[in-house]
Amino acid sequence: SVGFKAGVKEYKLTYYTPEYETKDTDILAAFRVTPQPGVPPEEAGAAVAAESSTGTWTTVWTDGLTSLDRYKGRCYHIEPVPGEEDQYIAYVAYPLDLFEEGSVTNMLTSIVGNVFGFKALRALRLEDLRIPPAYIKTFQGPPHGIQVERDKLNKYGRPLLGCTIKPKLGLSAKNYGRAVYECLRGGLDFTKDDENVNSQPFMRWRDRFLFCAEAIFKAQAETGEIKGHYLNATAGTCEEMYKRAVFARELGAPIVMHDYLTGGFTANTSLAHYCRDNGLLLHIHRAMHAVIDRQKNHGMHFRVLAKALRMSGGDHIHAGTVVGKLEGERDITLGFVDLLRDDFIEKDRSRGIYFTQDWVSLPGVLAVASGGIHVWHMPALTEIFGDDSVLQFGGGTLGHPWGNAPGAVANRVALEACVQARNEGRDLAVEGNEIIREASKWSPELAAACEVWKEIRFNFKAVDTL
């Protein structure tokens, strides 16, 4: 018909296309959709595709000025979620032309920007994205990646060890630097600013950076190992963030840090570019992630936030522990840990991976395990996370009865014992406690740590299930 038909029509007439064959250049999304009572799943899935691409609530005559077929998102498959009533996985394909090159910000604004407040849905969760190689190639990704970081640090064949300096707020810069020095001298590779240490009245950023740099170089000179402290460059403005990163570089610090969700993807990508251009490693903290990813039926799964970070750029990112005080179920955690580190990841629904993902040689990100872990967890952590990880013990270092440096010694001895045992073919899952006990015979520091934390458990039911 020549005329334009005004009015409201069902989304599924335009946006539900089960016969569609996805293209290699499409961005694919898997949404967990909970429709309102009476809304059929096809309509709900189509509504998601429409509202996150070209659609609006009514027909508009300007639709005729473009080719909707070329630009619309399409819901191409719907399946019920096993064991859940009235919940569906809706698969949506987006043409690549809907997205600005090299902008995670634009990608997320399109895919999850508006549609989550949509009335026809009771709840909506983005479970996974398939990023096509054509789009990945528009991103720089991590400033350096796993191999380059190992070469810079000259550390191979084992996980790296870190420690978040506690109490996280309230120390003066001088005392803070002292704690950094003691931990690094004792045998850790890194120490870390807490995510909320920025520049507060009790410790301004410049003073902290100076004392931490002094601690790093003193510990390096004494141990003969390369050391680092994650200097948190997160700030209220991008200009201030740059100022902090520049000062870190001028001090000769090896690594800076950013809170990528509170700081935002635009700031994060800018900082990642600066870090690559200036030889700084970039540690990423995921503060605020649980606001977005903790609810099972609404929000975004962390694997999406992790993929977005690999595109935006970061050399380390916090990824749960499986064994500590914070959320993280084993198979699902390992699923997104692989998505961070590996170049090619096969679809595997049992691990929450909805799509095969090819990163086409984008550098990988080291997974950071942090939160309520101590020496007794070391065998499990070594087995679960493998070598390409950073194991961070805050209280598990600074809580040692003899002080910070002995706490660091205990962790390093425990780690080296676990790595050696693994390399000799022993089963860490079965013999873990025995390996730690053996090692503690030769290390009084480790023996004291074993005594303090022998009864600590964080046993709660996992929330992050399929």
From Swiss-Prot:
Cofactor field: Mg(2+)
Entry keyword annotation includes Transcription: no
Pfam families per the UniProt record, alphabetical: RuBisCO_large, RuBisCO_large_N
Cofactor: binding comment: Binds 1 Mg(2+) ion per subunit.
An example molecular function term from Gene Ontology annotations: ribulose-bisphosphate carboxylase activity
Residue positions, PTM N6,N6,N6-trimethyllysine: K5
Ligand binding (Mg(2+)): K192, D194, E195
Keywords of this entry: Calvin cycle, Carbon dioxide fixation, Chloroplast, Disulfide bond, Lyase, Magnesium, Metal-binding, Methylation, Monooxygenase, Oxidoreductase, Photorespiration, Photosynthesis, Plastid
InterPro entries xref list: RuBisCO, RuBisCo_large_chain_AS, RuBisCO_lsu_C, RuBisCO_lsu_C_sf, RuBisCO_lsu_fd_N, RuBisCO_lsu_N_sf, RuBisCO_lsuI
Reactions catalysed according to its record: 2 (2R)-3-phosphoglycerate + 2 H(+) = D-ribulose 1,5-bisphosphate + CO2 + H2O; D-ribulose 1,5-bisphosphate + O2 = 2-phosphoglycolate + (2R)-3-phosphoglycerate + 2 H(+)
EC number: 4.1.1.39
Record GO biological process: photorespiration; reductive pentose-phosphate cycle
Origin superkingdom: Eukaryota
A GO cellular component annotation in the UniProt record: chloroplast
Record PTM N6-carboxylysine, positions in chain: K192
Mod. after translation: The disulfide bond which can form in the large chain dimeric partners within the hexadecamer appears to be associated with oxidative stress and protein turnover.
Main location: plastid
Gene3D superfamilies reported for this sequence: Ribulose bisphosphate carboxylase, large subunit, C-terminal domain (3.20.20.110), RuBisCO large subunit, N-terminal domain (3.30.70.150)
Compartments where located: Plastid, Chloroplast
Enzyme class: lyase
UniProt-listed PANTHER family: RIBULOSE BISPHOSPHATE CARBOXYLASE (PTHR42704), RIBULOSE BISPHOSPHATE CARBOXYLASE LARGE CHAIN (PTHR42704:SF15)
Family, per entry: Belongs to the RuBisCO large chain family. Type I subfamily.
Subunit structure: Heterohexadecamer of 8 large chains and 8 small chains; disulfide-linked. The disulfide link is formed within the large subunit homodimers.
Name by which UniProt lists this protein: Ribulose bisphosphate carboxylase large chain
